[in-house]
């Protein structure tokens, strides 16, 4: 999956079973990307929206509950990509490309995992792509007027090229253990 509009590209390759619900996929995406699952989300697959129905965020297309549909059920054999939006305020759009559909027994290690990726996920509530660009300008320039406040806000140094697949997999495993 690719975080749309990011340059350089922020992307992750994950492996998940086809019998996983969209709600569970959402948690795997969160862990792999580095998001904290602090905001609403939705998937749009073949024009149908799936998510957590919320009266405040009613769209023209009614949302179906993402915990009631598996990947197998919504993807079939024809769907090769779909979108995932996280944080409707910041509007993080992800394009998810389907490489292959596997059953759990065929998966490496038998559990969902992040296989590869590049570049750090933007901090939560940074303000979308525009806010992220401003954040990067401030954090990378010690003379920038907002440098110190942005470092404090994000909790210290931030490496936009930083991505650790092992850390992503620890987060995925942690969520899987909590979900059991």
Label each region the model flagged.
Residues 1-180:
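Short linear regulatory motifs enriched in tryptophan with gly/pro/ser
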